[in-house]
Swiss-Prot record:
This is SPbeta prophage-derived uncharacterized protein YotD. The gene is yotD. It comes from Bacillus subtilis (strain 168). It comes from the Bacteria.
Amino acid sequence: MDSREQIDWTCNECNFSWIGDNSDFSCPSCDEIDIKPKNKILD
């Protein structure tokens, strides 16, 4: 059972936004790790 959430992330450095699960990863645009979840997306 895959219970990973899809979260709308925003990078604090370059302000890029993307959808991803709640694992630790860096911004796909500028590679900055200073990211924050913008809002959780419910199924």
